[in-house]
Amino acid sequence: MSTRFGGTRGKVLAVAALAAIVASTFSGSVSAVAGGHDGDQARPDHWGVITRNTIGSPVADLRNGPFGSFGVTGPSASPPYGQGSLGIEVADESTSLNPGSEKVDFGNEVDFYGDPVQGLRRVGFHVFQTGENVAYGGDENMPNIRFEIDPNLTGLNDNYSTMVWVPDASPVTNRWSGFIDATTSGYWFLTGNEVPICNQAAECSLEELRTALNDGGQGATILSAAVGKGRDHMWIGAVDGLRINQTIYDFETSGVRTRRAG
């Protein structure tokens, strides 16, 4: 009797262990879990540090908060969505390269791939800016939104450039900002001089950049989308509520949630 019981018990334990492994595997494959409100969508989470666009030892980490700074109350005292955000830390003069500053992109190389640049209509984010960051690099020492693209320009044998949004100064420091609209503030430029009228020395609006890329060819397509910082000044802060068209990307410690924009 005891032998039979021991054998049965062993089989039960083995089945339970196998079930736990399967459950763990499937729960780990989807970290952007719907919260059951505000139109959250459950989907595979393809967000993370884009390693080939990273220099030095920067930090881009899904974190709780920031909450504050101390003494700050009301909506600006916590992330605009949920409890978390994307924490970013980059240093200057910290590598053996020239310049010596760090760079990081936290982005998605899957879900936007092949989307038309002409379809970008609403872009922006919320930022937690600090007075220290302003001291490090001035009022406009801010993170960026970057889209790697294939310009597909007629007569130009080049299939790579990066669209970069440079925000204006944050309207507040040491607390969360409201939504900063990348279609009406700051400026955009293209790397690589694909469109000279929208390079880093010739600032463009998003509308002007889209128009410059619309030269009658196949049309520019997106390769990746990211929030990043560098290479310029030290910056330690956070971003949340990245908006791309009608989707808001809510950065949480458990992953990146998607919400429908109102």
Give the location of each predicted region.
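Extracellular/lumenal carbohydrate-interaction signature centered on repeated Trp-anchored short motifs
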Residues: 108-123, 213-216
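Short carbohydrate-recognition loop motifs
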Residues: 71-105
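A carbohydrate-recognition surface predominantly in extracellular/luminal proteins
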Residues: 39-49, 118-130
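Acidic, glycine-anchored loop motifs typical of Ca2+
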Residues: 153-158
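Extracellular beta-strand ligand-recognition surfaces/modules
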Residues: 139-149, 176-258
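Solvent-exposed strand-to-loop "edge" motifs in beta-rich extracellular domains
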Residues: 87-91, 126-140, 150
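Extracellular glycan-recognition surfaces and repeat-rich motifs
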Residues: 36-84
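Secretory targeting and sorting signals
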Residues: 1-34
